[in-house]
Amino acid sequence: MSRIRFVQLNHLRPSQQRGAAAVEFALVLIPLLALAFGIVEFGRTIYHYDAVVKSVRAASRLIAAYDPSDSVSFSSAATQARCIAVFGKTSCQSGDTPLAPGLATSHVKICTRASVAECPDLQIADVQNVSTGTGTGTVQLVVVRIDGYQFGFLGLPFTGVGTSVQFNTISSVMRGI
């Protein structure tokens, strides 16, 4: 009967195994860094999306305080609302930094029943407030939205992965005066 012989797999001396852990660490570090960068970039995207949503809400809150039938004051308020939506303040200067990179006042659309040209896909009507019986009459709705905004990623240059994502339409509807 033959005897079974066990072969020792770890036949290298410790002095010959130096650096093996460093090589393994380097091989694992590359995907871990890419994963960490992706997580940070995803968080950055969510942060900018939230900033844009809040600025649109603030712009609609401002424009809702003006009567759309008064074209002079409403036009001035619309300009201020566009500045709030993009820059976070009521006045725009040429050197101002937008809240999100690439955001411009041309992305902001302000729509009311009287001015539907900027939002042809919306049907805005005054809402008759008859259910309460208080006699408050009609309620004017104001819509502020951002269309076509593309958020640019920092990106990993060697991957060739997409460098931007287009956000869906971000809108806020408020009850006007």
Regions found by a protein language model. Give the residues of each.
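Short, conserved structural patches
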Residues: S2-V7, R57-I177
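Alpha-helical assembly-interface signal, strongest on the long, hydrophobic N-terminal helix that forms
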Residues: S2-V86
